[in-house]
Regions:
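Conserved acidic catalytic loop of the alpha/beta-hydrolase fold
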Residues: 74-88
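C-terminal catalytic histidine-bearing segment of alpha/beta-hydrolase fold enzymes
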Residues: 70, 174, 178-206
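Gly/Ala-rich beta-loop-alpha elbow adjacent to hydrolase catalytic centers
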Residues: 91-100
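The feature captures the conserved acid-bearing segment of alpha/beta-hydrolase catalytic domains
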Residues: 125-178
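Short, surface-exposed "cap/lid" segments of acyl-processing enzymes
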Residues: 19-52, 56-59
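Active-site nucleophile loop of the alpha/beta-hydrolase fold
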Residues: 59, 117-129, 163, 186
Length: 206
């Protein structure tokens, strides 16, 4: 589905659709600081079972080197273009959710027109486009604000998911006709109920 050269230059994970299932939709999933971990794998299984292949971007590896929003946006565009799917779901967890708005807002209109949904799982108010080991220990007060970037996405359907015990989540602050906010039981890791997260994303597809 993707040219091998893209795998050579970006830390990508390809999860093919389940045998016998097909869809015209690609899911691009940007992971959190833990890399391609249990939450990303668990949610992706729901997508692939419904015929949607997943291309995962390992945020731990990708943002180990500092990136500009323009850099990240161009790489996202390359991923979407190389897969040749007419419709796309963008999903991100934690840092992946934090960076997606800035990546999307810099994409061409023709690319953005493909998006069925932008699913943000556990986004925080700020993001820095470089990983620091200290980020594993506490939330960062550095970086750029996520909400102003998100407010630029007026034509996208946004789904924001947060755990009710996640005090750092941006979701409760969001308002807008194109934004759905869902607060679930649990913390930033959603109590490990990843299948339910995947099902909720599917329910919000347009």
């Amino acid at each position: 589905m993707i040219l091998n050269v893209l795998f050579a230059v970006l830390p990508l994970v390809h999860v093919p659709a389940a045998a016998g299932a097909s869809s015209d939709t690609l899911v691009v999933f940007v992971s959190g600081d833990g890399g391609w971990a249990a939450i990303d794998k668990g949610i992706s299984r729901v997508f692939t079972a419904n015929g949607m292949p997943v291309v995962g971007l390992d945020a731990l590896k990708y943002f180990w080197t500092r990136r500009t929003p323009g850099d990240a946006s161009r790489d996202l565009e390359r991923i979407i273009d190389e897969t040749h799917k007419p419709r796309v779901v963008l999903a991100g967890y934690s840092r992946g959710a934090d960076v997606l708005p800035a990546m999307i807002s810099r994409l061409p209109a023709a690319t953005r027109a493909k998006f069925r949904l932008v699913a943000l799982l556990g986004p925080s108010p700020r993001v820095e486009l470089e990983f620091h080991v200290a980020d594993w220990l506490h939330s960062s007060s550095r970086g750029v604000l996520v909400k102003p970037e998100l407010e630029k996405l007026t034509s996208e359907h946004i789904l924001c998911l947060a755990g009710e015990d996640d005090r750092d989540s941006l979701c409760p602050q969001l308002r807008g006709a194109n934004i759905d906010v869902v607060i679930l039981k649990g913390s930033h890791h959603f109590d490990g109920n990843y299948e339910r997260l995947g099902r909720i994303v599917l329910e919000h597809l347009k």
